[in-house]
A protein has these predicted regions:
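Generic N-terminal amphipathic, Lys/Arg-enriched alpha-helix
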Residues: 1-2
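An anion-binding catalytic pocket shared by soluble metabolic enzymes
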Residues: 6-93, 111
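Short active-site loop/helix that positions an aromatic residue
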Residues: 99-109
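A short alpha->loop->secondary-structure connector
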Residues: 109-115
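Conserved small/polar residues in nucleotide/adenosyl-binding loops
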Residues: 118-120
């Protein structure tokens, strides 16, 4: 691994820990992928973010072959297809915020409140 790859792997872990700290994720749910070389780096399946090391992040190459000591996230295909289809994206973040999940279970709409969503 190059220094740059190690740096990106560590940034993925930092982002996962931040998601958890901010309540956007709990336990082993959710995942992050980053475009890397001809494929992507992605969080492993079933591993908690606490104690995760750079070597635990999985590389999935352009032929969808995983490289690493763990299996890639169970949602790796969805990450892979997004990064393949949308060249302007360099990362995919998938999380399970408690309130969003609760609203979904209750079948409640979540209203969008952001200036970019206001139609003039």
């Amino acid at each position: 691994m190059t220094k740059n790859e190690i740096k990106i792997r560590k940034q993925i872990i930092e982002a996962c820990l931040l998601m958890e700290k901010k309540g956007l994720n709990q336990g082993k749910a959710g995942n992050i992928s980053v475009r890397w070389k001809d494929g992507m780096l992605i969080t492993p399946s079933g591993i908690s973010y606490e104690g995760m090391k750079a070597k635990d992040i999985v590389f999935v190459d352009s032929k969808t072959k995983p490289h690493g000591i763990w299996k890639p996230s169970s949602e790796w295909r969805f990450h892979f297809d997004i990064l393949k289809a949308r060249k302007e994206f360099d990362a995919v973040v998938h999380n399970h915020p408690a309130y969003g999940t609760g609203m979904s279970i209750l079948r409640k709409d979540i209203k969008a409140y952001h200036l970019s969503l206001i139609h003039i």
